[in-house]
Amino acid sequence: MDKGLHFIFCVVTAVLLLRESSQTGAMRNDDAMIKPNDLRGPEENLPSLTVTTILEDPYVMVRSAELEGYCIDLLKALASMLHFSYKVKVVGDGKYGAISPSGNWTGMIGEILRQEADIAVAPLTVTSAREEVVSFTTPFLQTGIGILLRKETISQEMSFFHFLAPFSKETWTGLLFAYVLTCVCLFLVARLSPCEWNEPKNEENHFTFLNSLWFGAGALTLQGVTPRPKAFSVRVIAAIWWLFTIALLAAYIANFTALLSSGSEQLSIQTFEDLVKQRKLEFGTLDGSSTFYFFKNSKNPIHRMVYEYMDKRRDHVLVKTYQEAVQRVMESNYAFIGESISQDLAAARHCNLIRAPEVIGARGFGIATAQASPWTKKLSVAVLKLRETGDLDYLRNKWWESSCLHKSREGWSPLQPQALGGLFLTLAIGLALGVIAAMVELSNKSRHAAGHIKKSCCSIFTEEMCTRLRIKENTRQTQETSGRANA
């Protein structure tokens, strides 16, 4: 009996111990699962850094209670290369870093100065004012200042001469020159070629200069017109002009169709000068950002106008966060001035947004550290290595990819003369061949005429050319008729 009770007691004790062990293991596994990825625990002999950052898409974002984004991936790569552990904290006041009215620094710069953080890994612009109080590494991203707009608010209305837009001014000028040159060549070749004159009594040529102009214009509209060329040389020029006009019309129709289907690319606001001259849109930037101080310190008259506008209306046009700025652009007549690289992402993810072409104030995003920090040099070298190996480009493509980019049309632009250079060259070769053929035809007739009237071929050729180019009428007597008259 005692042995039986002792056996039962041992079994129960073993079961309880196993259950407690399994529960402890489950709790440890749960702890491992909820451990956020912004915390890399201290390891043996590894220094630990406190990293301050700011929530901004796609640099740092919250996903399922964890931080992710471009800067988080960059931080992981740097920690792996330099062998340090880190703890990420979001900046308390939600600001990047500027001097407050009291003379103290706010944002991430202030946290580094107060030693609340060791480094700042964020889209933090390298400026001279910040460089005076903290140190920056080599920039990991290059950017500038651009204008973010909503397409519907700045689409340019079609002008009265919108039909001329498919070709640039230079192309239209080249086309007009090609038309006039071709008609002149038609007229001259028809005069020089004996086959284009009606014989035997009175030679008559239907290719007057006006008829040549009409013939060229008819080809531009794909319409057959009279007179019809008879000489081989004239037909060469006519054929090459027809081919030229067919290819030209195809290019015009294709580009005009692209123009009509991508009218949103024709922006009324292309530059900051356009922005300050218009009155339809309000514009502003992030309060306390480096962009605001760029315009404040600039000596450029246009930049000063931008700053004065924002300073007078700072309570209304300056925004607190980047997300607020994008939302305001989408919902109201508002243009946001900020980092061009962030605007590219907004335009990629919101297909009704677009960035104006002009970008000013080239700058870079760097990692901020305390002055005289030993980590500044190490982090700079690591950033350069990541750039050389293409890892920074990989991160850029990873976090800036968007379906909107694949759907967007290619930017439209008028056709330049360079795009049609081969076409104009082909026309020039055809005109040259036509003139050469006319000279050959005239020389053949001169050779036959020289045998009948006992003169040299060169003299007959010269007389014929001068006669055909001098006569004002479109009819002339043949050599036989003129010879009888002289007799």
Curated annotation (Swiss-Prot):
GO terms for molecular function: AMPA glutamate receptor activity; transmitter-gated monoatomic ion channel activity involved in regulation of postsynaptic membrane potential. Residues 191-235, 441-487 are cytoplasmic. Belongs to the glutamate-gated ion channel (TC 1.A.10.1) family. It comes from Gallus gallus (Chicken). Residues 24-169, 257-419 are extracellular. It comes from the Eukaryota. Keywords: Cell membrane, Glycoprotein, Ion channel, Ion transport, Ligand-gated ion channel, Membrane, Postsynaptic cell membrane, Receptor, Signal, Synapse, Transmembrane, Transmembrane helix, Transport. GO terms for cellular component: AMPA glutamate receptor complex; dendritic spine; plasma membrane; postsynaptic density membrane. InterPro entries: Glu/Gly-bd (IPR019594), Iono_Glu_rcpt_met (IPR001508), Ionotropic_Glu_rcpt (IPR015683), Iontro_rcpt_C (IPR001320). This is Probable glutamate receptor. It is a multi-pass membrane protein. Its main location: membrane. It holds the Pfam family Lig_chan-Glu_bd. The chain crosses the membrane at residues 170-190, 236-256, 420-440. It is found in: Cell membrane; Postsynaptic cell membrane. Receptor for glutamate. L-glutamate acts as an excitatory neurotransmitter at many synapses in the central nervous system. The postsynaptic actions of Glu are mediated by a variety of receptors that are named according to their selective agonists.
